[in-house]
Each structure stands twice: as C-alpha cells, then as structure tokens.
C-alpha cells in the first residue's frame, strides 16, 4: 500500500514538472498591448500592439472588428488574406487589413519576426476573433 502511495505521489510530481516545462516554452506568436485609447470617432478606439512571431509561428486565421494597419520592424512574414494571393512582407514594409476580413500571418523564416500593429476597432469588442474550419 505504501509503495502505491509513493508511486502516485511520484506520478503527480512528474506531471507537475512536465506541465511547468511545457508552460515555460516560448509561444510561437505573442501579442503585447502597447496602448489602448478612445479616439474621436464615436464607438471606436485605437489599439497599438507588438506582434512577435517565432519561426513557424502565427496567430492563426482570425478577424478584427475594425482595420489593422501594421508595419514589419524585424524579419518577414507571409500574409494570407481571404480572396487574395499570399504576400511576403519584410522589415520596412507595411500592410492594411480591412475590418472583418479573415487573415493570418506566418513567420516562415529562421529568425524572429516582429510587427507593430495599430487597430482602429469597435470599442468593447474582442480585438481578434479566431476563425475555425477554414
């Protein structure tokens, strides 16, 4: 009985260590909010964010409740927009995504890619809504 108890305790400790190790991994995409503020357009707000893409990373297909205006500051990404061909966007280049358009961006390079994004969106709505089953 004592042996089973020690085995169970060891299994729990192992599981907790494994979870801690996995949660310590760097995410493939990270969005850090830089600023969020009301603007003069009624019911709208501006949000600025830093997007960091590890190699192979991206947010997955999603939409925004307003326009996205982004500038690549490091590396390059491949931009995928519904109804348009994929486009490589590199450091020093920018792009605009219209409101509600399904899109994704992926870092297909070997180094980190970073963008600064400004969103002019409907206040009180989620900044990004994932799209599944595409």
Which residues does each predicted region cover?
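Short histidine-centered beta-strand/loop micro-motifs
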Residues: 59-64, 81, 88, 106-108
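Short acidic-glycine-tyrosine-enriched beta hairpin
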Residues: 53-54, 83-100
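A short, N-terminal "cap"/entry segment at the start of jelly-roll beta-barrel domains
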Residues: 2-50, 88, 96, 126-134
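Sec/Tat-exported extracytoplasmic proteins
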Residues: 51, 57, 73-76, 81, ...
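Glycine- and acidic-residue-biased ligand/ion/polar-headgroup-sensing regions
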Residues: 65-83, 93
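A short beta-loop-beta micro-motif enriched in histidine and acidic residues
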Residues: 40-44, 56-71
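Histidine-centered metal-chelating micro-motifs
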Residues: 58-60, 78, 95-106
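Ligand-binding loop in jelly-roll beta-barrel domains
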Residues: 86, 100-126
